[in-house]
């Protein structure tokens, strides 16, 4: 009889773990189906994972979803089914898509990842102002304005203007074409960046930093476009 309670104690954690793993992390989604009239996107608030495209062969729309991750997430999903995205919202005001990210309560024992996915018409302007985020931007935009404390940005496409302001930045900016009107400005305390414009493209670039490592295939050409200005404390940048 004495061994029975001990067996219960040994088996219960296994059963709880199995039941937890059998249930998926809680996912909640809000969607706006038609963004054909949108000309700008403004994302603000708390941290999120962002994916924005400008594909004409797919419907224009946006979704905002929350997913619980981290080692507490499976246990939380077993006991509760609360929405981790309760305070975030998304709306269209005229031609602007506004997305405001609000984190779940600090009492929430799990890690809630807010995911933003949108496909908007080419030529739209994009502004991101968040404390921390990762962003995958694939397409043709008019301008990109990014501000925050920590930013991880991957860009593949074209934008006439890119402005990034953050304490810590990791950026990969790969232009698929050059129209000789591009301006890139990055200010960060710590920066690790790659900028690709293509082979044999004259670039006017300036890097100002306390400590820097700059790898460029060709010297700066004053007055040329694209124009790149980088200011920071600790900078590592490759320019191609």
Indicate residue ranges for each PLM-predicted region:
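Bacterial N-terminal signal peptides
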Residues: 7-17
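Acidic (Asp/Glu) and glycine-rich low-complexity loops/linkers
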Residues: 18-129, 138, 145, 156, ...
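Fold-core signature of tandem repeat domains
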Residues: 135, 153, 171-173, 193
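N-terminal secretory signal peptides that target proteins for export/translocation
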Residues: 1-2
